[in-house]
Amino acid sequence: EAGEECDCGAPENPCCDAATCKLRPGAQCAEGLCCDQCRFKGAGKICRRARGDNPDDRCTGQSADCPRNRFH
């Protein structure tokens, strides 16, 4: 939704303020394959294992999303 930084559906989420749908102070992310304990995983961390001839997908260190490698 517009203006939301995170999914405010779960009040127990330690990264997201359920009342405002904003990240809590100090949090970089609230969910995603490249989010761990409210912080972006480091660049190069595997977020999706290789399948077939495609290599592993790896976090960028700048986002909670797991980017698809260029071979997909």
From Swiss-Prot:
Entry keyword set: Cell adhesion impairing toxin, Disulfide bond, Hemostasis impairing toxin, Platelet aggregation inhibiting toxin, Secreted, Toxin
Source organism per UniProt: Bothrops cotiara
Keyword Lyase: no
Free-text function comment from the UniProt entry: Inhibits fibrinogen interaction with platelets. Acts by binding to alpha-IIb/beta-3 (ITGA2B/ITGB3) on the platelet surface and inhibits aggregation induced by ADP, thrombin, platelet-activating factor and collagen.
Locus of motif Cell attachment site: 51-53
Domain Disintegrin: 1-72
Source taxonomy: Eukaryota, Metazoa, Chordata, Craniata, Vertebrata
SS bond partners: C6-C21, C8-C16, C15-C38, C29-C35, C34-C59, C47-C66
Protein name per its UniProtKB record: Disintegrin cotiarin
InterPro entries in alphabetical order: Disintegrin_CS, Disintegrin_dom, Disintegrin_dom_sf
Presence of the UniProt keyword Isomerase in the record: no
UniProt xrefs under PROSITE patterns: DISINTEGRIN_1, DISINTEGRIN_2
GO cellular component, one term: extracellular region
Superkingdom of the organism of origin: Eukaryota
Region feature (Disordered): 51-72
Entry GO MF terms: toxin activity
